[in-house]
Amino acid sequence: MSAQPKPIQAVLFDLDDTLLDWSGQQNRIAAINRPHFDKLYGYLAAEGHSLPDRDVFFHSYFDVVKNAWNEAKKDWTAVNFAQTLQTNFTLFGLDITRIDMEAALHAYDWQATPEVTLYQDTIPVLDTLRRQQYKIGLITNSMMPMWMRDIELRAYGILDYFDVRLTSGDIGFMKPHPAIYEQALSLLHVDAARAVFVGDRPANDIAGANAVGLVSVLMSPPHLHHEIEDIQPDFIITQLGELLPLLESLQNG
């Protein structure tokens, strides 16, 4: 008689504050991005574009991004990094038809943030999941294309663990919109009921996972204080290592 399939076949993760520890850095996003934006500014200047004052250009860009995220929350249509840059370029009269956006994104030179680290148990958990033959996915509400976030994953040594990696910026919808979960499940060839989703934001990660029918696990480390309100995860963990015995119990029914 053939073996029965495992009740849980795949584990999907959020990235920031789930696999990566951003504690103490959440309010430094502008400062973290500033040196990269300066590199983009230098690239545009070298290409012969007439640019405004560097500080004015930068602060305008972050206003564009803030407004884009506020708009996105109305229907969970994703913010797209290249589009926010183009919006800011247009505000200052730059001819976007003369800007090679792929080259501009590379000029931004995105890298892993030195102050951001893996959680202590990220690699041991991913190692165990791989050894136990789970399919592993990643879904992040990032406006950047996945190739830019891959730079971080490669730097942290975890890129090769994932069978599927998606950013909302690439897909066009952000969590909790069902489309981004459904895309990941389709690529993994796994039904929602046979997959676990682990994330730190109840209103995004957990609400979306619940709506699609995934087993939802809220990652709630001590430094995070997201309001759960009326959103109920199936399980709550405070560190990634707690996921392994939880999966074992799900497999054993």
Task: Spell out what each predicted region is.
Residues 1-11, 23, 42, 46-52, ...:
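Asp-based, Mg2+/Mn2+-dependent phosphohydrolase catalytic module
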Residues 4-119, 124-127, 131-132:
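N-terminal helical cap/lid subdomain that shapes the substrate entry/recognition surface
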